[in-house]
Amino acid sequence: MEELQRYLEIDRSRQQHFLYPLLFQEYIYVLAHDHGLNGSILYESMENLGYDNKSSSLIIKRLIIRMHQQNHLMISVNHSNQNRFLGYNKNFDYQMISEGFAVIVEIPFSLQLVSSLEEKEIAKFHNLRSIHSILPFLEDKFSHLNYVSDILIPYPTHLEILVQTLHRWIQDAPSLHLLRFFLHEYTNWNSFITPKKSIYLFTKDFTKENQRLFLFLYNSHVYECESVFIFLRKQSSYLGSKYSGAFIERTHFYGKMEYLVVVLRNDFQKTLWLFKDPFMHYVRYQGKAILASKGAHLLMKKWKYHLVNFWQCHFYLWYQPDRIHINQLSNHSFYFLGYLSSVLLNLSAVRSQMLENSFLINTAIKKFDTIVPIIPLIGALAKAKFCNISGHPISKPVRVDSSDSDIIDRFGRICRNLSHYHSGSSKKQSLYRIKYILRFSCARTLARKHKSTVRTFLKRLGSELLEEFLTEKEQVISLIFAINSSPSHRSYRERIWYLDILCINDLANHE
């Protein structure tokens, strides 16, 4: 770690040109696999190959020696088991190097993130990483908007596009050549095994074996796809700065402001006229994005046309226009982050009296509403073998050596995680049914293990089994409920967003 820290203190421009030598440092692989390789994909691969944890450092050294030998870095002509990629085991060596390579190329981006946070004086930046931080933003902004577009960001179909994307950020030519070699070799190997499935790089096998590298490449690709929003927003803000003067160093820019506005107007007048909208909001999670606006339907159609042409011309991606859906927020619900969100119109009547005359005033208040869709969630539970397709709880096959406490803790942890993630739902009826399914699935699993009945286990465990399926907040509310039922009932219906959720629950991710 000390060696890596010294390297990080080098000037940023020099780092981008000298990333490749880090690939031959042992501490990079130790850092990539959590200081000892325990619990990582690499450690599991070693167990499958018959290695133990003590020899992991020796394996890395042998791999680095083979990397120095150029004859092992040549693309194999015939894909056979005897002539494998980078040595004796292609998959094992590829995982090791891809994990280390992902750590190395993340260095310039990490430095930019740290410097940006320091300039903006953001101390608790981990709160910004939370998925639930998006939902309060939607709750605050979307109630004032009119139209929303569901956008599915396309995957890159050509390997060279990914390499050229990184070339704009990293000037280290050997690292880019190595990345190009990795991607082509992987697709060539897959085309030999499964010829019909070699068109796309981001397959399930690639994402599972090279998760860190996949996330880095995919995030880089998505950032480039989103560059059109950043570009148009900046140009639009430049035009508005003629009257507001929103420059940091105003004394140096006042003289050039008029000329700058004239140039931008001449070059981008038509484009900005199409897309300038002060009430445009954009959010994204993984490959799905939401674009909402207060403008008219025509403006959203122009954005759709521009995005399709931009992705096709700039990234050579054939994107189907029907993958972007434009709907009105007042009569349409959109699915995002495991929630079915919509804008409800609450009507209320207020009686006003002035002297002898009374008036009845009707008011309409827009409210952003989020609910949990029960049918997709039950489908996810059925896929995980907790229930059947109709939502009836079933028993899960477990290992004989699993104790009753381990089984109860596992089911309870899944239930608490789902309740924790869906705490922002305005209606808790769906969560009640999910808890019922998981609780009785746990009871059926225990009854199956001991060859008994469900009623017997429910009588024996009683409240102990119920407590495992309650979150900490529900346990506190259950204590308050005995004192005063009305306030606790209201608090139980409140929506709560947690800033400690960094990833979506697997059972909730059924998009």
From Swiss-Prot:
Subcellular location: Plastid, Chloroplast
Database matches in Pfam families: Intron_maturas2 (PF01348), MatK_N (PF01824)
Gene name of the record: matK
Protein name listed in UniProt: Maturase K
GO function term, MF aspect, one: RNA binding
Family: Belongs to the intron maturase 2 family. MatK subfamily.
GO biological process: mRNA processing; RNA splicing; tRNA processing
Domain of life: Eukaryota
UniProt entry keywords in alphabetical sequence: Chloroplast, mRNA processing, Plastid, RNA-binding, tRNA processing
GO annotations of cellular component type: chloroplast
InterPro entries registered for this protein in UniProt: Domain_X, Maturase_MatK, Maturase_MatK_N
Role, per record: Usually encoded in the trnK tRNA gene intron. Probably assists in splicing its own and other chloroplast group II introns.
